[in-house]
C-alpha cells in the first residue's frame, strides 16, 4: 500500500432517519480496497463532517480528499467542508465528483477549493488520478477528468462507461456503522439500498441522467446481484431492497433473469421503471414480477398528452401509463407515477390536463402514488471528446429555459435559494404565482385525500381525518386555498414522497 490515504466524503443531504448506504463513495472505495488506506464520512448520519475530516487529515498523510456532490441542497455543505479542508491543509488536493461537477464542471473548478473534477463514472478515473498524484506526473491524458492548468480549465476526453461486473464489489464489511443504514420502511424493517445497473438509454429532455450517462446503460450480471443481496440479507439481516438503478427494467430479456434472482431471494423491493417498457411485458414476465415481491415502482408518466411527451423526448405514450397502471393493480404493485408540470411552452394548459389524467389514474388504481415536479431543462455537460468514440452530446445548456437567466458560474451562486428550487424541480423562472399556487393546492388536496402508503408513522385515525377533510374538495375539484388541510397537516405530519420518498 502507498502511504497516502484517501478520504471520501458524502456531505449532508438528508437526515439520519432517511440515510441509505452512501453507494457513490462506497463504489469508489471498492477500487481502493487493498491498494491504499481509505475512509468515508457521511454527513447524512448527523456528523460534523468538517470537524471529523480535519481530525482524520491530521492523523495521517492523505493523497487527496474526494467529495461527492449532487445539485441542490448538497452543494452548500460540500462548500463548507471543502473550504475548511483547504484552509487547514492547503497542500491536500480536493476532488469533486458526482452529478453537480459532472453537469457544471466549470462552476466547480471556478472555486479555489476544488482542484479536480471527476466527470461521470468515477472509479477508474479516481484510481488513475491517484497514481498521477503519487508520481507527480501530469493528468492531461486521464480520461473523465477536468482540471486547472494555470488560469485555464481543461476538460479531458470522457471516459467510456465500465460494466459493474468489471469493477470490484462494494466493501460492505468495511462500513463500521452499517446498522445505521438498514432502516425501517414500508418495504421492511431493515431496508437496504443497492444499485445493479447504471445509466439509461433514453434521453428525456428534463433528466440529469442524460448528461451523466449520455444514453448508455450497463447492467450487472444476475449472479453478482444474487451474491451481493444475499450477503446483505444473510450477514446483516437486510429484509428489503430499495434499488437506485436509473432504469431497472431496461429490456424484457435482461429483466427476466434479474426477476428470477429476486424471486429466489424473496426480499420486497422498490425500483425506477418506464411505463412503455412495463406495458410491453408478457403475462409470464408479469407473473415473475409478482413472485419477485416488487412492492412499488417509480414510473415516469410525466405528461397528460402524447404531444407533451414528444416535446420532452420521453419516447412513451399516455396509453402506456394507463396500461401499466392496470397491470400493476392486477399484480399487486403500487405505481408511483411522477409528472413534470409547467413546461415553458404551455405551462397552464399542461397542468390542467395533467390534473384530469391523475384523477383517471386514481380511479383505475386508487393506491397509485402521485409525485408532482416542475419542469427543469436538462443541463447538458460540455462536449469533451469521447474516449470511446461514442456519439456527441446534445448542445451545452447556457441559459435556464427560453430567455431565462444565465447559469451560475460558481458553487456559491448555485446555493442561492432560487437556483436550489429550480434544480430540485420545485419552481421555474417562467411560472406565475397563480400557477405555483394552483399546483400546490392540488397537490395538498390529493395528498390528504390519498395519504401515501410510504408513511408508516401516521395512525389510521390520522389518515381517516385527512381523507374525510379532503373528500369534498377532491370530489368537486375545489382545490383553491385548502386552508383547513394546511391546518390539519400542522397536527398530522405526513411524509411527502417527492421530498423524502423511501
Feature map (PLM): residue ranges:
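Glycine-rich beta-alpha loop elements in corrinoid/cobalamin-binding modules
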Residues: 31-164, 377-380
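Structural motif
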Residues: 5, 63-64, 116, 240-242
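Radical SAM [4Fe-4S] cluster-binding motif and immediate context
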Residues: 165, 172-335, 356
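A short, glycine/small-residue-rich beta-strand->loop->alpha-helix junction that serves as a flexible
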Residues: 13-23, 70-75
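Flexible glycine/acidic-rich beta-alpha junction loops that bind and position SAM and/or redox cofactors
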Residues: 15-16, 104-105, 202, 253, ...
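Radical SAM enzyme core and accessory elements
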Residues: 2-11, 17, 58-60, 91, ...
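Catalytic cores of alpha/beta
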Residues: 105-110, 345-359
